Amino acid sequence: MRHGLMEAACERRIPMPNWCSNRMYFSGEPAQIAEIKRLASGAVTPLYRRATNEGIQLFLAGSAGLLQITENIRSEQCPGVTAAGRGAVSPENIAFTRWLTHLQNGVLLDEQNCLMLHELWLQSGTGQRRWEELPDDVRETITVHFTAKRGDWCDIWGNEDVSVWWNRLCDNVLPEKTMPFDLLTVLPTRLDIEVNGFNGGVLNGVPSAYHWYTERYGVKWPCGYDLNI
């Protein structure tokens, strides 16, 4: 239902990636209108956001050698994530290998796929790897990536320490709400796009989230601000 309604609402694209003023009218059954109001107010659980955080953590775990592939897979997008080579055929490494395949395939972050990716994250055991317990060389590798992508992977206005950020990813609290009129809950984004980040530069041959959003949603911030419902 959501997908069809939003396709109709977004049929007229406005070529302006920053701020747009829109007036939308919806008609439908009471249950449909109630769902649209929940979307407009942000009262929707953003499963894609959890899948994104888990994906970033798995990406870093592979880059730092905490997790290794169990098959001969070469990541053309980011060779560093498989640089540690093949590892033991353990449940954790098998889960990582399956997750990496989904990253390479650019899986859509719809509800079903987000739940599947969450199961792989749980099986990988990454959430149990607290910062204080990581080897020094692993922490150094993670810190290098974090420093380069801080603005994309956490609050751009914040000054969160890498250790606090990593442990927050381990805690993996699922947000109860999202931004008003969050289009990413309606027209799903992709795992590789979100790991690559708004400014890109992490994965070779993958668009930045900025370019993906402006092409797919018509704006670079696909959510609502200052809504009157």
Predicted regions: what they are:
Residues 1-15:
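Short, Lys/Arg-enriched N-terminal segments with co-localized hydrophobic residues
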Residues 14-229:
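Long, contiguous binding/interaction regions
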